[in-house]
A protein has these predicted regions:
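N-terminal Rossmann-like FAD-binding beta1-loop-alpha1 element of flavoenzymes
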Residues: 2-28
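Flavin-dependent oxidoreductases
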Residues: 15, 175-180, 184-264, 268-278, ...
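Glycine-rich FAD pyrophosphate-binding loop
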Residues: 22-42
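Dinucleotide-binding Rossmann-like beta1-alpha1 core, especially the glycine-rich loop
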Residues: 46-126, 250-251
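Short beta-strand to alpha-helix junction loop
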Residues: 62-65, 90-99, 138-157, 275-280, ...
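Helical element adjacent to the flavin cofactor pocket in flavoenzyme catalytic cores
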Residues: 138-195
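C-terminal catalytic lobe of FAD-dependent flavoproteins
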Residues: 248, 257-258, 273-396, 403-416, ...
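Iron-sulfur (Fe-S) cluster-binding segments and ferredoxin-like electron-carrier domains
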Residues: 404-415, 438-456
Length: 481
């Protein structure tokens, strides 16, 4: 029997696994997709919010401020790309200045460090490319940018290293209470656990309803984005927000940790995991972004994408044991600031176990920390040493991002190895650049096939069914109709 079964391995599930792996508990993760961080965590704004937006007294307010501080420590410890660049919330007319004042007061009540209100002149001195309509801004220096999929992956890898089991392609399709805990129906059979942690993202309400009376409803909400080439990456130095509204924090313009510029999202209620981009949605995003930063060159876009976030009808995170279901712990409604709050949310699970007297003493032999080779960032002498030790690091496969064969092979041999082309991309950035894998994709496919010992026809782009190759073109008798 498991001590803890975690359903879902996005950033919240990964953070819960990382936190629980510090204790001698038999913990396992059950993830429906074929990789970690393969839903909301891979498609969002990649912002660690300062914490001025949530209403004081809410779980969001407390956990956002706690979480962004913890994230900084975790990213440093686990070698995750992170940059504390600060954020600016713009008032685009004098009429919006009272809204900034309200956010400022929220921030003070929530304990956000260093926030201050800026005049129009101070704002444009920090960001000369902003609209001349800017009437002022709220500056929050603790806001940061991060690589969200690497963040989740790093925590999951360290958790696995320390004994947490990870079951991919393992959706939980049934939950029954037992005398000693819970029984979960999975593709490999029924699994029993004393505790269940529901970190199922946009499906968390459905998972909850398997175990307890209905308590909350999640409305999946799609947000569409532009990712612009690195030629636009210096367009702004801070995360640029507009005044938030009932649909969220609005359309932002921000640098990324990889040197690009990200613009978005809109907010469109959808059914399920609908991540299609639409002409209307992208037109709205570009028009809204130009209100903040007029000179963005959208012709430099290298990719459009959409993510789906879990808007919950409670208006706040749903965290705690479900009513009438002891030992079933919800971590639900993790819309923004879910990414920012994740490590603090994970500590809530530990507090629940501790409160029930089920938390053993922490491990004394815990193996924390993680490093990753980033060849292009190394000084010349370190590159030479690395190539001398392993010539694979001397063969550049992804020219856009200068990613070597050695780095791709590393991604295929980690605690949670990549099994797909997009899985490689999320681990080492191969295919993330200007050509979006047009040049390196076939070589990455070849390396996956060779390393995993599978037919090239079986290599996936990402999710199940996304086979890249359909047939061998020179095979005798092949029909290409």
């Amino acid at each position: 029997m498991l001590d803890v079964a975690i359903i879902g391995c996005g950033v919240v599930g990964a953070a819960a696994a990382y936190e629980l792996s510090h204790y001698p508990l038999h913990t396992a993760i059950f993830e429906a997709e074929n990789d970690v961080a393969d839903c909301t965590t891979k498609a969002n704004s990649a912002i660690l919010h300062a914490g001025y937006d949530p209403e004081p007294g809410t779980r969001m307010a407390r956990l956002n401020v706690e979480g962004v501080a913890l994230a900084k420590e975790i990213c440093a410890r686990l070698d995750v790309p992170y940059r504390q660049c600060g954020s600016l919330v713009l008032a685009l007319s004098p009429a919006e200045l009272p809204h900034l004042q309200k956010l400022y007061e929220n921030g003070l009540a929530n304990g956000v460090p260093g926030i201050r209100l800026l005049s129009a002149e101070e704002t444009r001195a920090m960001e000369p490319g902003l609209s001349p309509e800017v009437a002022g801004a709220l500056y929050a220096p603790s806001a940061a940018i991060v690589s969200p999929w690497e963040y989740a992956l790093a925590m999951a890898e360290v958790a696995v290293r320390n004994g947490v089991e990870l079951h991919l392609s393992s959706p939980v399709t049934g939950i029954q209470e037992t005398a000693s805990g819970w029984a979960l129906t999975t593709p490999s059979g029924v699994v029993e656990a004393r505790y269940v942690v529901n970190a199922a993202g946009i499906r968390a309400d459905a998972v909850h309803d398997m175990a307890a009376p209905h308590q909350f409803t999640i409305q999946p909400t799609r947000g569409e984005y532009y990712l612009l080439d690195k030629s636009e990456g210096m367009r702004v130095q801070h995360v640029i927000f507009q005044c938030p509204n009932e649909n969220g924090k609005g359309v932002l313009v921000a640098p990324t940790v990889h040197g690009n510029l990200i613009v978005g999202p809109n907010a469109e209620p959808v059914a399920g995991d609908d991540t299609a981009c639409t002409a209307a949605g992208l037109a709205f995003v570009s028009a809204a972004a130009r209100r903040s930063v007029p000179d963005i060159r959208f012709g430099e876009s290298i990719r459009n994408f959409a993510g789906v976030r879990a808007n919950v009808d409670t208006g706040d995170f749903v965290i705690g044991e479900a009513e009438g279901a002891p030992g079933f712990i919800d971590l639900a409604g993790m819309k923004s600031p879910g990414l920012s709050s994740a490590p603090a949310v994970a500590k809530e699970v530990v507090r629940i176990l501790e409160g029930r007297g089920d938390l053993p003493a922490a491990k004394t032999d815990y193996r924390d920390g993680r490093t990753r080779v980033r060849f292009k960032e190394l000084p010349p002498e370190e590159k030479a040493k690395l190539i001398a030790r392993d010539p694979a690091y001397g063969r550049v496969i992804c020219r856009c991002e200068t990613i070597t064969e050695g780095e791709i092979l590393d991604a295929l041999h980690t605690e949670i190895p990549a099994t797909t082309i997009d899985g490689v991309k999320r681990r080492c950035n191969a295919g993330m650049g200007r050509c979006q894998g047009g040049f390196c994709g076939p070589r990455v496919l070849e390396l996956i096939s060779r390393t995993r010992g599978i037919d090239p026809l079986d290599v996936l782009q990402d999710k199940a069914g996304s086979n890249v190759l359909l047939c061998e073109t020179k095979q005798e008798g092949t029909n290409h109709d």
